[in-house]
Regions:
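Active-site anion-handling motifs in enzyme catalytic cores
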Residues: 1-204
Length: 204
């Protein structure tokens, strides 16, 4: 990639649920509002990447319309992005839940990021009050977490877990959807041509 970016966001923004779309767009929007250029990092892979099977997902159609997106890199090659992005932001979702992200190696612990590049997690989650993973995988993950410049988590219970069990200082922060002004998601909702009846939504 020839273009350089201030920040690369790594997460599961390509997932097929609207919650992920809203979360990652809000994170992207918040960082862009800081005056930073942002690259959304495509799904890393260990084996064969089946791009065709993902091509028509509504999440990818949305992403292509709103983001700059990196190519999909094998986990052995994703380190090339160190020359593209100055900093890497991980989050926000259950990216440290072993059963969710084990297929990506340790990419979601930013193991590929060089020492000179900033490494930040924002509202990342273990999905439980314990870090459940095979011992060898866990120790490498903890080593990667200790290399990060800043660690924050979505659930308060994970603050205590990080500090008492893993020896990592973590901060409890808001989900990205609560960082943005009301027009952030309102503007993209207005892009839809679907006709829906008025209703009331509650976010808890």
């Amino acid at each position: 990639m020839k273009k350089k970016y201030d920040v690369g966001i790594l997460g599961v923004w390509f997932g097929c649920n609207y919650g992920s779309i809203a979360t990652y767009y809000s994170l992207y929007y918040a960082i862009k509002n800081m005056g930073k250029s942002v690259l959304m990092i495509h799904r890393p892979y260990l084996d064969h990447f089946e791009e065709a099977s993902m091509e028509d997902r509504h999440s990818l159609r949305f992403a292509r319309a709103h983001y700059d997106i990196s190519p999909a890199y094998h986990v052995d090659e994703i380190g090339k992005l160190n020359d593209v992005c100055d900093a890497f932001v991980l989050g926000a979702d259950q990216l440290w839940k072993y059963n969710v992200t084990k297929i990506f190696g340790h990419s979601y612990f930013l193991d590929f990021v060089n020492r000179k590049n900033k490494k930040i997690s924002y509202a990342t989650s273990f999905g439980t009050d314990r870090f459940k993973a095979p011992k060898e995988y866990m120790w490498k993950a903890v080593k990667c977490l200790r290399r990060m410049n800043y660690v924050s988590v979505r659930e308060k219970v994970n603050v205590n877990m990080c500090e008492k069990l893993l020896g990592i200082r973590a901060e409890h922060v808001l989900d990205p959807v609560l960082l943005c002004e009301s027009n952030c998601l309102g503007d993209i909702a207005n892009e839809s041509d679907r006709k829906v009846k008025l209703h009331c939504s509650l976010y808890t």
